[in-house]
Design a protein with these regions (language model features):
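Short S/T/G/P-rich N-terminal loop/turn motif that feeds into the first structured element of a domain
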Residues: 1-50, 54-69, 75-92
Length: 92
């Protein structure tokens, strides 16, 4: 069953540093190993990132791998985080 993470920032989000994170972490044009989908975008009060993973282990591995780089780039922690096993994941 797929696993979803939802990260929400309620303040200004440093998209320039987020793009640098993706460039330094690997191929920005491809999804990381185990990631099935990613949606990133600004909202009126900050930003949202939603990712769908093959498993919670894939999501954790990605998070653990990139935590030092996130700290180095001083990307603030999200205001809210939700993580859950999906009951339905469909794509076209």
């Amino acid at each position: 069953m797929a696993f979803c993470t939802l990260l929400e920032w309620e303040a200004d989000f440093p998209f320039d540093r987020y793009h640098e994170l993706n460039e330094r972490a690997g191929d920005h044009s491809a999804l990381p190993e185990g990631c099935l989908a990613r949606v990133v975008g600004p909202v009126e009060t900050g930003a949202r990132i939603m990712e769908v993973w093959q498993s919670d282990a894939d999501a954790k591995r990605f998070s653990d791998k990139n935590s030092p780089l996130i700290a180095e780039l001083q990307i603030p922690p999200p205001s809210r985080v939700a993580a859950f096993e999906t009951s339905i994941f469909q794509t076209r």
